[in-house]
Amino acid sequence: MPTGYHNFCDDELDESINFNYNRKPSQPKDYDDDSRTSGRTTPKRARGGRGRGSGDRGGRGGSRGRGGNGGSSRGGKKNGWRDEKPSLLSSILNSRQHASENREHMFNKSLRGAEFITFIKSAEVYDPSKLLKDVGVTVEEANVVNEVEDIHIIVPEVIPEVQDVTGADAQLEDQESEDEEVVTTITETYADDGDNQEDDDDEMLVDGNGQLVDDYDDDEDDDDEDDEIDEEVDDDLIADENAVDVSTLQDAINEVANDTINDDRKEEDPSEGSEADDEEDEAAEFVMDTEGDPDMVDMEFMETDFAYLNKKKRAEKSRTPLTSSTAVISDRPVASVSADTTLVGSVASKKRHNADPRAVDIPEYNSDIDPEVLKDYIESIKNEDEGSDAENIDWIRSALGTQLGGTEQYYVDSDDSENDDFDDDDEDDEEEYEWPENGTVGCIRNIVATRAASQGYQFMVEHTLDADMEEWWNEDLIRDSVAEHLGVSVSELPDEAYRWYVTRLGGDIEDPDLSEEGINYSDYYDDSDEDEKAREASEMDSLIQSLIDDEVDDRKALMDHGYTPPMTKSRGKNQVPNFGVNDPELQAQLEKHWVNSRAAKRAKREQRQAMRKQGMFTKEFKQGGIIPLHAKYPILMTVEEARKEIEIFINAPNKPMVLDFPPMGAEFRSVLKKLSACYHLKPDIHGVQKSKHVSMLRTSRTSCHNNNYIQKFHDKFPKKFKLVIRNAKYSTEQYLYETKHQKGSKRSAVRVHNREGEIVGHEAPAIDDSNIGRLLLQKMGWTTGEGLGAQSRGISEPIIAKVKISKRGIGA
């Protein structure tokens, strides 16, 4: 296909390459013989197959391909379509400018209406890499010009060191610009997405006059670039022989930019600085007093912000001059401060008129309180803390005459002078004993719990004998441990020492002085409770006596009052018990009732057993009144019984459809199958493992008049042939009884039963001559018939074995 651009035009056409899609060609082409069989020569579309090719291009597929009526795969004339004019679709797809130049002409007019297409060869071959290269050069030139212009504007105003580097001296400029040409290399890196990816960095050369010198071969592009750079670059820029340090320039630019930003802020509000200066002069100066407090000399304070959400105030704070390298801003605003006051770690805050409503105002300190009053109040609080409640408790005791801290309130004898010094005596006793350093008293480490028992207290003890176990110890064991710790005997152990150590170990025992024995009752004591208890006891005795003389049924009331009836004497089976009644008539009446109740219970029990055997307690009998066979025959069933059950099933008035037999073994199930065939019943097996049983279904031919079949069945299986049932009490003996008659079973072999006293093993063959043991004996000198042992004193005949069934023997 020719390379270049195509134009839709009608003038100045080349007749050699013009063709029309709406007409037949004026001069038909001559094709080879293959074209006649492969495709059609007419311009009509091919109809056969799934092809899309026309007559001019020939078929492009086979019989099932994309061609015409089924020809060769490439068409008629070899390379015919390549030598002829290209199609309209291929020319559009391979054109580079059809979308931009001819979009309106192509899509607004019908493609069938375009009569002529002219292909004109372009002046030069289309090269995409050349276009990308031109674009890259243009971008690079623009970047270099901008960089040089920025350096010229910023550098002279920064620092003298940079001016010397860039050659800002006017004398050097006049001398060196005339004599020689100084070239400065400026490197600019850019991403090239074209085909030329090998050169990532392009170097641009700048001479003394500000002209750029590059290494491109195109002279026309160089002239255009030089003209643009001459117009933008200033003549004052003179490059040094060495390359410019870009990092130094960047730092200088950043510093100048920061100064410019600060100047702009001052220009926005010129009056703000003067007002701030006036307020600072009027306000008191605050000094960071870190020398007065030695603890704050080396302390580093954390910078914090105010709790007010006000952008304007934050801007003012950021521009506030700091008195030191680190400023500490307090979160609490100061309401009023005098000139003599020195604050540490705070800065004077201005009065906020437009504060955020969410800000919390902290109340200021009220300085109107008298310092002496405040001092007295603090001392009184300290005095209250130093005192204890013991003095108050003693005062209340003396005033009320009562003991505090117990569960009961009782009066104390006022004449007893020892109660006044009760606490002092305890303190003296506690000081007499010493607590061991290891915290172990004897073998006791700790008392976990305490409980009261009938014979004293019991303690849950952790001891050194077994650290992983806790045991309940009585008071005797605790006293032994305490006495062992003190080095005295148990009889010499004081009770005060025992209570002191038990309390320190964690035990909770009651002080004997506070128990009932130590209570001194006053004149207010009343014994009315004892009289009431005695009255209740007499009433209970009379009630018990009256119930003893009454009937046996009324003795239940005695059980509610804790009465236990007398134990009856031992008696034999079915003997009347002794009721312990002195009245002979009552005794005879009780014996009669007992005999009758026993007889009634026995009769009822026998009746229930009979009904259970008949299957009347089963679910089937309760629902439908039918006794199941597994309940009726729990162990055995004969063939005659099975035949009768089948006849009852067939002649039943309600005509049930299914008859279920009890679970049986495989041999007995096969017998029932043969029996069902005599009555034209359909047998079926249900259940799994030991619960497999035979179910007989009624059919249209079921009847009881097949006497010939029944007689033949009984000839093989007699009427007394037993069918073993597998019930809940199915035992191993029943299983053996089932399996010993089965064919192919190992149990069907005849067993050898030895009788009592029978000799066994006498027919066993002698040891062969090839036996290793016999060979060893022969080498040692033994011969056949000779006894074993030294000098042949051993037995020469084997020991006789006799069967003993009645006894098992010693060690069995």
From Swiss-Prot:
One of its GO terms (cellular component) is cytoplasm. Its main location: cytoplasm. GO terms for biological process: mRNA processing; RNA splicing. It comes from the Eukaryota. It is found in: Cytoplasm; Nucleus. Belongs to the SQS1 family. This is Protein SQS1. It comes from Yarrowia lipolytica (strain CLIB 122 / E 150) (Yeast). The lineage of its organism: Eukaryota, Fungi, Dikarya, Ascomycota, Saccharomycotina.
